[in-house]
Design a protein with these regions (language model features):
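Short alpha-helical elements
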Residues: 1-316
């Protein structure tokens, strides 16, 4: 019976719909390896105390690569992915694999390196057009909120367009090419406009930033305008009509591209699930999923052509 289950799980991993090519594995590993060499060289040079003499069997770049491949391939069960897919099909890439329990411990130690790699090597560049939005990250079902102990004191009850939830919010800023420019994680009860008041969150943004009606705030518009950012939002039904450029009106309608990015992060990269057993595992899962999305060859994007015109349109 054990052999039959093994074959079934092995075939399930082998027939995964999101095929991972050898070139993509090599691309991810080379980027992670080059970064880890420089990062840990600086870290060891400036760290206090003695460095451990015994090094893990797997290198830092191998661990980060496996973490990213899991989300890139749209796998659902990490234990089966590591035990069967990595240990057998990718044996030539990772010849010195450790046990599953040991690998989970090593994953948590790579959070700092993965965070720095994500911000320095994986995020996109500003193109002058950016979109901002938030999406809920549920950690449990609503009927189990009082019984949840993993995120006690960390997660909070918030409300989105889909109703109430218990968990966190992922705030994203993307450009018109679908590339993630920056992100931040907050408790579920934090206002969507609050992260925009942090200059570190919007330091890569210039020119125009498009958002939905939930970001309407006169003081926020003035605050961002000082930093060279023009926040453009829709208007509510009880507000007066305003004049805006035709280009802004068209791009405001294209704001749904960031909803598509959120959908791919949740359904393809599995950024949201309720099987976390620690907060560090939750952070590791989100960072790995965002890094995997950055390696997608084709991202949601908008196509447009700018024609210079001084015409203004009435936004109705």
């Amino acid at each position: 019976m054990g052999f039959i289950i093994f074959v079934a799980e092995y075939q399930q991993i082998k027939l995964n719909p999101m095929n991972i090519t050898h070139d993509k594995i090599t691309e991810i590993f080379y980027l992670a390896d080059d970064f880890c060499k420089e990062f840990y060289a600086v870290l060891d040079k400036n760290s206090l105390g003695k460095n451990p003499k015994r090094k893990p069997m797997m290198s830092h770049s191998e661990i980060i690569t496996i973490m990213i491949i899991f989300h890139y391939g749209s796998f659902r069960n990490f234990k089966h992915f590591y035990s069967y897919y990595v240990s057998f099909q990718l044996r030539s890439y990772f010849p010195k694999t450790v046990s599953y329990n040991r690998f989970v411990e090593l994953m948590e130690k790579e959070v700092l390196a993965l965070t720095m790699m994500l911000h320095t090597c994986c995020l996109g560049k500003d193109t002058g057009i950016a979109f901002v939005d938030s999406t809920p990250i549920r950690v449990c079902k609503n009927k189990r909120i009082k019984r949840n102990k993993v995120f006690k004191g960390l997660a909070a009850i918030g409300k989105s367009t889909m109703g109430w939830f218990h968990g966190f919010k992922l705030h994203l800023i993307i450009n018109d090419k679908g590339e993630i420019l920056n992100f931040v994680i907050t408790p579920g009860n934090v206002d969507d406009r609050q992260p925009l008041k942090d200059k570190k969150f919007v330091e890569k943004i210039r020119h125009k930033l498009y958002a939905d009606k939930g970001y309407i705030d006169k003081n926020l518009v003035e605050l961002l305008f000082i930093d060279g950012i023009h926040l453009i939002t829709g208007i509510r039904n009880n507000m007066k009509n305003t004049l805006m450029e035709l280009q802004d009106k068209i791009l405001l309608r294209k704001r749904s591209v960031i909803e598509t990015v959120n959908d791919e992060l949740k359904n393809m990269c599995q950024i949201e699930h309720s099987r976390h057993r620690s907060f560090s595992n939750f952070i590791t899962n989100i960072l790995s999923a965002i890094a995997a999305y950055c390696f997608f060859p084709k991202k949601p994007a908008i196509k447009y052509e700018i024609v210079k015109s001084d015409q203004l349109s009435l936004f109705i």
